[in-house]
Amino acid sequence: MIFKSYILEENFQSINNCKLFLFYGENLGLKKEFKEKLRTQNKIQEILNLFQDEIIKNKNVLINEVSNKSLFNEKKIIFINQVNDKILDIVDEVIENMQDERIFLFSDILDKKSKLRSYFEKSKSCGIAACYQDNEITIRKIIMKKLNGYQGLTAQVTNLIIQNTGLDRDKVNNEIDKIISCFKDKKIDLEKIDLLLNDL
C-alpha cells in the first residue's frame, strides 16, 4: 500500500495498521524524522536497530527476533537499515510469523523495477513511502512551522536559512535548533542570525 510522505508528516498514525513498512529515497533528513517519530510514538516498546548485511549473513538474527517474545515488552519494533532487493525473500518468510512485532525498513533510492518496492506497493498489509528530496517550498514550510510565533521571521531570514543549508532537511533542522536556542525570547535579530548561520 502506497503512502505519500507529505501526508505521513501530517498524519503519522495512518501507518499503525501496517506490520511492515518501507521508507525509501534520497531524503535522509525525512527518513531520520520518521524514525524519530516512530521512537517517540513507541517509547514503551522494545526497539531494535539492525542492518541488512547482518541479516543476509545470518537470517536467523531476524527470524529469532520475530519469534522470541520479550519478557519486558509486549510489542517489538525492528528497524532494518540500508535494505535493497536482497532482503525480500527473508522479509517474505518473516511476515508469516509476525504477531505483535512491526518492522520498518529504510532504503536509499529504489527504481521502479525493484522487487522490494513492487512487493510493498502491491501488498495490502505492508506500507511504503517514497522520501524524495525536499524543494524550496517544503523547506520554507518546515521553517515557517518550526519558527511559528517568532518575531522577525521575515522572507530575508527564511532565504538566509535556505541559502546556508542547500535544501538539506537535516541541516535546516540543525539551524532551526540553533535559532531556537539563541533566541529564547522568540525575537529574531537579523544581524545575530546572520552571524549564527554563517558560523557553520
Where are these regions (language model features)?
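Conserved beta/loop motifs at nucleotide-recognition and modification sites
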Residues: 1-200
